[in-house]
């Protein structure tokens, strides 16, 4: 059987790139030749070379929010990017193009269509982004992490496959074993400000925890993001709250295994990791996220009683303190929430996406 050549398109943020990397590794494990299409400004420039995957760059940026000048320039920039993508697809003689959203996926998907190459797309969020909504009309197969992502979009049948996440998170001990082993300890609170940091979360948590009696306070492990480590540590000190504060947590599997409750944003990858790990959560969606997709992501967990969704615009330190006081005191409820989250997981997401790619490529 001919060795498959597959171009993976993903870029901009970790939410696009990490799931794509998981599928790329699965495809390579099956013997496929994989190359990557991205842009010069995205996180893929660091992550993809580390994975020893050839990285091809095209010149394209987002159009939304760029103003009139950006809209006028867009057709010329997109046309240029499409021709760059055509050249890359021809050079590697791709059998299939696989898109995960982000700026590079649009021109790459159009190039695939113009060259008659099969296109498969995957949407990570609970509401499809602009690029994937457009590409869904020309793709051979449309995959989504969550049901309803392409609601009100004229598209083919959507297959719900989940989000690929790192295997180490699926290899944690069972939920009941983890939660029961800590039954006599103070609860463990993991706070994730995200790799870039969520200022609202970083500022709110120290103030909320300060309102709890010392005997009620959990053990705290707080990831602040690179720019907010010192300022957040200073806030905890000012509020006289003990916390382990780190700009970045390298081993997220260990962090999830440690946690009884996670407070975090509701990015697609984070929500999928909470499901995979089986851990209770209180989600504070980013209010400025495009199409308010984080609120929709949070709703996936909240609607199944597998997490709590909060609203940043109205959330106060007193509100959060009350939630923590009630939630952390009820370990059986935390464990049940964690188990419900894990029931929503898709442990074989990367393999499922790879299966679809192989099936479509072989026609």
Swiss-Prot record:
Which reaction does this chain catalyze?
di-trans,octa-cis-undecaprenyl diphospho-N-acetyl-alpha-D-muramoyl-L-alanyl-D-glutamyl-meso-2,6-diaminopimeloyl-D-alanyl-D-alanine + UDP-N-acetyl-alpha-D-glucosamine = di-trans,octa-cis-undecaprenyl diphospho-[N-acetyl-alpha-D-glucosaminyl-(1->4)]-N-acetyl-alpha-D-muramoyl-L-alanyl-D-glutamyl-meso-2,6-diaminopimeloyl-D-alanyl-D-alanine + UDP + H(+)
Q: Which residues bind UDP-N-acetyl-alpha-D-glucosamine?
A: 13-15, 125, 166, 195, 249, 268-273, 294
Q: In which pathway does it act?
A: Cell wall biogenesis; peptidoglycan biosynthesis
Q: What class of enzyme is it?
A: transferase
Q: Which GO terms describe its molecular function?
A: UDP-N-acetyl-D-glucosamine:N-acetylmuramoyl-L-alanyl-D-glutamyl-meso-2,6-diaminopimelyl-D-alanyl-D-alanine-diphosphoundecaprenol 4-beta-N-acetylglucosaminlytransferase activity; undecaprenyldiphospho-muramoylpentapeptide beta-N-acetylglucosaminyltransferase activity
**Entry superkingdom:** Bacteria
Q: Which key words are in the record?
A: Cell cycle, Cell division, Cell inner membrane, Cell membrane, Cell shape, Cell wall biogenesis/degradation, Glycosyltransferase, Membrane, Peptidoglycan synthesis, Transferase
Subcellular localization(s) per the UniProt record:
Cell inner membrane
Enzyme Commission code(s) on record: 2.4.1.227
* Gene Ontology annotations of biological process type: carbohydrate metabolic process; cell division; cell wall organization; lipid glycosylation; peptidoglycan biosynthetic process; regulation of cell shape
According to its UniProt entry, the function of this protein is described as: Cell wall formation. Catalyzes the transfer of a GlcNAc subunit on undecaprenyl-pyrophosphoryl-MurNAc-pentapeptide (lipid intermediate I) to form undecaprenyl-pyrophosphoryl-MurNAc-(pentapeptide)GlcNAc (lipid intermediate II).
Family as reported in the entry's similarity comment: Belongs to the glycosyltransferase 28 family. MurG subfamily.
What is the protein's given name? UDP-N-acetylglucosamine--N-acetylmuramyl-(pentapeptide) pyrophosphoryl-undecaprenol N-acetylglucosamine transferase
State the organism named in the record. Cellvibrio japonicus (strain Ueda107) (Pseudomonas fluorescens subsp. cellulosa)
- Gene name in the database record: murG
């Amino acid at each position: 059987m001919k060795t498959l050549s597959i171009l993976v398109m993903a870029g901009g943020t970790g939410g696009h790139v990490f799931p794509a990397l998981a599928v790329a590794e699965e495809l390579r494990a099956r013997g496929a030749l994989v190359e990557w299409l991205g842009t010069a400004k995205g996180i893929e420039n660091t992550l993809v070379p580390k994975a020893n995957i050839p990285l091809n760059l095209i010149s394209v940026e987002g159009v939304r929010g760029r103003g009139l000048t950006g809209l006028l320039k867009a057709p010329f920039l997109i046309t240029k990017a499409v021709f760059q993508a055509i050249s890359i697809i021809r050079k590697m003689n791709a059998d299939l193009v696989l898109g995960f959203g982000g700026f590079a996926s649009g021109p790459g998907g159009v190039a695939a269509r113009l060259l008659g190459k099969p296109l498969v797309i995957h949407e990570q969020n609970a509401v499809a982004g602009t690029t994937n909504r457009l590409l869904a009309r020309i793709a051979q197969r449309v995959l989504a992490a969550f049901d309803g992502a392409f609601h009100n979009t004229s598209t083919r049948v959507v297959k719900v496959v989940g989000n690929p996440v790192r295997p180490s998170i699926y290899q944690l001990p069972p939920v009941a074993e983890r939660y029961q082993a800590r039954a006599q300890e103070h609860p463990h609170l993991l706070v994730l400000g995200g790799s870039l940091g969520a200022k609202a979360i970083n500022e709110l948590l120290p103030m909320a925890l300060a309102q709890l009696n010392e005997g009620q306070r959990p053990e705290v492990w707080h990831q602040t993001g690179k720019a907010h480590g010192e300022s957040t540590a200073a806030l905890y000190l000012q509020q006289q709250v003990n916390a382990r504060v780190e700009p970045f947590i390298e081993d997220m599997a260990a962090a999830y295994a440690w946690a009884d409750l996670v407070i975090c944003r509701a990015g697609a990858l984070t929500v999928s990791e909470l499901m995979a790990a089986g851990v209770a959560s209180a989600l504070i969606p980013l209010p400025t996220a495009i199409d308010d997709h984080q609120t929709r992501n949070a709703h996936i967990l909240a609607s199944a009683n597998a997490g709590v969704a909060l609203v940043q615009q109205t959330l106060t330190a007193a509100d959060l303190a009350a939630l923590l006081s009630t939630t952390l005191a009820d370990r059986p409820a935390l464990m049940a929430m964690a188990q419900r989250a894990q029931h929503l997981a898709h442990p074989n997401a990367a393999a499922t996406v790879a299966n679809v790619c192989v099936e479509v490529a072989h026609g």
